[in-house]
């Protein structure tokens, strides 16, 4: 009952200071996935010669937060969310296997994990145990902050992105632009629902009290990645 209330109220608050303009939010339409399986919703199966990225937000697996990822077709603009995963029961140790299977399936998608906390373990399993080839890394470059790439080495390298104020701000504002200019399209009910309550708070953006923002954060990571030089080289996109 309480859960329903949260989901329901989170839907229709259409909060005041949403990251995405309310006029845009009102036009977003959801469709049913073509395939559903234990938290994985597929909207479009992998297509030959298409390029995909997956961005991952890892929860501790104790019920409050959801571990989540989105798969985005980045072959050309508009980019499109073709699959999403969201599960609040999955144990962090099992999550990498799901990430691996889905990413492989989507033409060995590039993966970018958020590595603040337990995400670091997930990324390590992908890199060292499963030996996934297309894991994106980040390197700290002083005032430039984190830059993204592959095959970095050295002390200041992480197997993913550390969610910092800067990353969150840059990612959020770029996400706003991408969505409002129709450069990113999606038809997932939960993504739309989270964006409806993803609001400006204390000079940052986060979910309204009692709502979730796991998928929204995956999109923020994606939007941060898209404006990186490395991504532009990867795809020849501006």
Placement of each model-derived feature along the sequence:
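Acidic two-metal-ion nuclease catalytic site recognized across multiple nuclease folds
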Residues: 84, 213, 220-238
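Intrinsically disordered or highly flexible coil/loop and linker segments, enriched in small
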Residues: 4, 14-18, 105-108, 181-188, ...
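ATPase catalytic-site recognition across NTP-hydrolyzing enzymes
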Residues: 1-56
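Structural motif
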Residues: 165-166, 207-215
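Gly/Thr-rich phosphate-binding beta-strand-loop-beta motif of the actin/hexokinase/Hsp70
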Residues: 47-74
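Well-ordered alpha-helical segments embedded in enzymatic catalytic cores
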Residues: 68, 94-98, 217
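Short, flexible loop/turn elements at secondary-structure junctions
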Residues: 12, 26-29, 58-62, 73-76, ...
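Mg2+-dependent endonuclease catalytic cores in nucleic-acid-processing enzymes, primarily RNase H-like
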Residues: 75-202
């Amino acid at each position: 009952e309480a859960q329903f209330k949260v989901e329901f109220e989170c839907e229709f608050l259409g909060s005041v200071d949403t990251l995405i303009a309310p006029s845009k939010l009102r036009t977003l339409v959801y469709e049913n996935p073509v395939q559903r399986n234990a938290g994985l919703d597929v909207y479009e199966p992998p297509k030959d010669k298409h390029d995909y990225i997956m961005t991952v937000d890892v929860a501790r697996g104790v019920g409050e937060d959801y571990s989540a990822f989105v798969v985005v077709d980045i072959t050309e603009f508009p980019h499109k969310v073709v699959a999403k995963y969201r599960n609040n029961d999955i144990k962090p140790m099992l999550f990498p296997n799901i990430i691996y299977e889905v990413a492989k399936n989507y033409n060995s998608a590039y993966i970018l994990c958020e590595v603040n906390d337990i995400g670091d373990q997930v990324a390590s399993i992908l890199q060292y145990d499963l030996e996934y080839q297309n894991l994106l890394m980040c390197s700290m470059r002083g005032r430039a902050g984190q830059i993204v790439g592959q095959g970095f080495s050295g002390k200041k390298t992480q197997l993913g992105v550390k969610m910092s104020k800067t990353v969150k701000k840059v990612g959020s504002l770029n996400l706003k632009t991408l969505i409002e200019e129709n450069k990113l399209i999606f038809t997932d009910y939960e993504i739309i629902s989270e964006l409806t309550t993803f609001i400006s708070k204390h000079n940052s953006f986060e979910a309204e009290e009692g709502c979730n923002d796991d998928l929204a954060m995956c999109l923020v990571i994606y939007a941060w990645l898209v404006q990186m030089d490395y991504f532009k080289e990867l795809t020849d996109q501006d």
